[in-house]
C-alpha cells in the first residue's frame, strides 16, 4: 500500500450512490470491502436517510451480499440520538415526526415518545408530514 494508506485504520462509506444505487450493488463494492478486510482496515456505513431503521439497512445490505451488524452503521437517527444524549441529557420526552421504523431506536435509547408535553421535537423524513402537524406540536 502507498505510504499514506498504511495509516488508515477505518473507512466510512455513505451507502446510496456510493456502494449501491437504489437496490443494485455496484460491482466494485464487494472487492473493495474484501480489499479493506485483507488489510485489517475496518469499515462502517453512513446514511443521512432516516426513512429506514438501522435494522432495515442491515437487512438491505445482507440481501445484497454484505454481512454486517448494526454496530457498523451510523445513520442520521443514530446521530440525532447521540446529539440529544450528549448536548441535552435532561430531555427524555420527544415528539417524533418520522417514519414508524425509527421509533424503536429512540425508545431503545431511553426516550419517551409522546404527543403531549414533549421537551423536544424531532423532525425526520416522513411521507405524511404536514406543516400543520408541526404547528400542533
Predicted segments, located by residue:
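HAD-like aspartate-dependent phosphatase fold
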Residues: 1-15, 19-137
Amino acid at each position: 500500500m502507498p505510504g499514506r494508506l498504511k495509516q488508515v485504520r477505518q473507512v466510512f462509506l455513505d451507502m446510496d450512490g456510493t456502494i449501491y444505487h437504489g437496490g443494485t450493488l455496484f460491482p466494485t463494492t464487494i472487492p473493495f470491502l474484501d480489499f479493506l478486510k485483507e488489510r485489517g482496515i475496518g469499515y462502517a456505513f453512513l446514511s443521512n436517510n432516516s426513512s429506514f431503521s438501522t435494522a432495515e439497512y442491515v437487512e438491505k445490505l445482507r440481501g445484497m451480499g454484505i454481512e454486517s451488524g448494526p454496530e457498523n452503521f451510523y445513520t442520521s437517527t443514530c446521530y440525532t440520538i447521540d446529539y440529544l444524549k450528549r448536548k441535552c441529557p435532561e430531555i427524555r420526552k420527544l415528539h417524533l415526526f418520522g417514519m414508524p421504523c425509527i421509533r424503536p431506536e429512540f425508545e431503545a435509547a431511553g426516550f419517551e415518545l409522546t404527543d403531549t408535553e414533549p421537551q423536544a421535537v424531532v423532525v425526520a423524513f416522513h411521507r405524511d408530514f404536514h406543516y400543520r402537524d408541526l404547528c400542533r406540536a
